[in-house]
Amino acid sequence: MYLSRPTGVARFAASSSSSSSASLFPGVDVDTTTKTGALHFEETKERIKKLFDKVELSVSAYDTAWVAMVPSPNSLNQPLFPECINWVLDSQHADGSWGLLHNDQLLMKANLLSTLACVLTLKRWNIGHDHMSKALDFIKSNIASATDENQRSPVGFDIIFPGMIEYAKDLNLNLPLAPTNVDALVRKKELELRSCRSNSEGGKAYLAYVSEGIGKLQDWDMVMQYQRKNGSLFNSPSTTAAAFMHRNDDGCFDYLRSLLQKFDGSVPTIYPLDIYARLHMVDSLQKFGIARHFKEEIRSVLDETYRCWMQGEENIFLDASTCAMAFRMLRVEGYDVSSDQLTQFSEDIFPNCLGGYLKDFGASLELYKASQIITHPDESVLENINSWTSRFLKHGLSSDSVWSDRTDSVVKQEAVNALEFPYNATLERLISKRAMESYSGDIVRISKSPYACLNFGHQDFLELAVEDFNTLQRIHLKELEELQRWVVENKLDELKFFRLHLGYCYFAAAATLTDPELHDARIAWAQNGVLTTVVDDFYDGGGSEEELDNLIELVEKWDPDGEVGYCSKDVEIVFLALHSTVCEIGRRALVWQGRSVMRNVIDGWLALLKVMRKEAEWSTNKVVPSMGEYMEQAHVSFALGPIILPMLFFVGPKLSEEMIGSCEYQKLYKLMSTAGRLKNDIRSYDRECKEGKLNILSLWMIDGGGNVTKEEAIEAIKGDFERAIRELLGLVLQENTTIPRACKDLFWKLMSIVNLFYMEDDGYTSNRLMNTVKAMFEQPMDLDALLNK
């Protein structure tokens, strides 16, 4: 929409045509119409793919006005960038204001800031008197918002807005403001300045960032220390314009000129933002569970980000959020990035930068998430960041408000999720479900002024995610029915000693292996999960010694009609279920692997049964093993071996005998199983202690000779758990190893589901987990409800 100029108002000639639009993104058609019918899945995907091509930023009236104020070096009475003045003339809203069109009533401070900046521009060049009159009416009507603590405040508002009021006096512009309003604003500015100047390096960075509000009193030598390679100050057009007016710096001029060439008569509030915006987009697609549809585009973004990382790109390392996101996403995808680059964000150094001074909640959240990707034993910088950010986030959640470029409710909910579900206890389907349920549609951020970017969370992300989630849910329900038939056909429901937890077992598979084509892997995971629970219950009191030995002998011979025979109906049911299931897995795996894997799977089961038999003997004979002896058996008896191996055959890569027998495979398996066993033993200690069962916690206290308390033992075991998962993650993320990455990922995912299950109780008794399982299978996502909540 173009706004007409009053008749007779002069217009500056610009070197290039200028245009304006009420749309956040001129020239970009943003369809926000709710689709109630079937989604055109491929069309939605294509629209999202186009977002990778270009980062679209909204125009900032505030920053454009400051650039418009810059005089020509040849004549102080002529503007250097007349096209910006034309944009200001064209872009006033009907209510007399300038600024981003939005529905947030808490952004009135931003509107006041942008409107006053545009008024100063017009007054500076003695043009647009009718525009100014309408704008002054707007300011007069809304000035109360300037001191309203409930309003979202642009960065530096308490310095910049009073500073512009003082500048208006220099221009002989009479603002319709009551002296009491002006005095209150000036007092806030003075308090803010005193606070900044007493805060060393962080305060200096902040004062430099809001230089336009300080004007002639600014220490411009100090400000120019923050100049970047692209000539800007903080990638901020307004700060850079103010610096150029006072220092006539060539770098500042080159930056401003390049912006005008790119954005055709107007500027955004921050530029460049490409790296951050694209990383944020990738992160959003991953959280929504639809990243697999954009593998090539995501790889391209990460390759480019890694190139910039290795070149020391300022736009990564001078921004905490960007640096933290880049580190996390690159490391998780196997790129070699050092945590040393995050030293600048440790607790004692972070306050020295702008984000640290602002106590940026969003940046701290990104740093917290990055700090969890520890893959080496000596990454103390990540431990430091994890410690202070977790404390900072928890404190922020208990306070009324935090500072962030996003709305409080959105960023706080993300923090709640991040703290409650750390990286080592996350499941893809649960993450995507939470992302959809918390979708706000808010693509607006606030810096010195509000700005919008489609890459931050286009509605198409939600539409594609909902369709994808519901499609997978239908697949999962069919697979669950298949598994229910399998239970009945194999008579597992007739076993009296058995805790049937089919829903949990399949939930673990479905929430982790989300690709539709991974049907065989999900079925194998669930079936073997059920069967390991069967044999665990059988060897944990459900069977006699004769039955336990009988089952082992049957598996060794692997002949259901052989001479061994069955000493009981329970043994017959267990063995025949195991035999038929393993044989079916072998038939399916032959298609994927091109070779028989039956022996591998059988050997895995045999190893588990023998270890469980050994532990049953310990229990019967009241043997108290050493901690080393216990863990050597217990990591196997945790029963992940028969689950993980069959899955690996169904995820794509071909696994040779040499790979399965490699030291790397054994290490992955042992680390995963050890971590799971330690977590299980901590959670189940009280119950197992009452039942007289062995547990690493009780053995630790026994080994301490009575000098180790339960709490001390728990802390020690937690330390062992953390070391195990760090080493596991490091091995999973390591490139160019024997085991393919797609297979290594399953070790981490299986460990994560175990960790999640044992975050509360013993994994099977949590009501919240039970409700989560039911919701994932029974509740489809409703797009209209999500958009209209």
From Swiss-Prot:
It catalyses: ent-copalyl diphosphate = ent-kaur-16-ene + diphosphate. CDD domains: Terpene_cyclase_plant_C1. The N-terminus is blocked. Abundant in most tissues. Present in low amounts in mature cotyledons. Mg(2+) 2 binds at residues 536, 540. The keyword Plastid applies. It is an enzyme of class 4 (lyase). Its cofactor is Mg(2+). Gene3D superfamilies: 1.50.10.160, Farnesyl Diphosphate Synthase, Terpene synthase, N-terminal domain. Keywords: Chloroplast, Lyase, Magnesium, Metal-binding, Plastid, Transit peptide. It is found in: Plastid, Chloroplast. The keyword Cell wall biogenesis/degradation does not apply. Binds 3 Mg(2+) ions per subunit. Pathway: Plant hormone biosynthesis; gibberellin biosynthesis. Coiled coil: none annotated. GO terms for biological process: gibberellin biosynthetic process. Pfam families: Terpene_synth (PF01397), Terpene_synth_C (PF03936). Belongs to the terpene synthase family. Catalyzes the conversion of ent-copalyl diphosphate to the gibberellin precursor ent-kaur-16-ene. This is Ent-kaur-16-ene synthase, chloroplastic. It comes from Cucurbita maxima (Pumpkin).
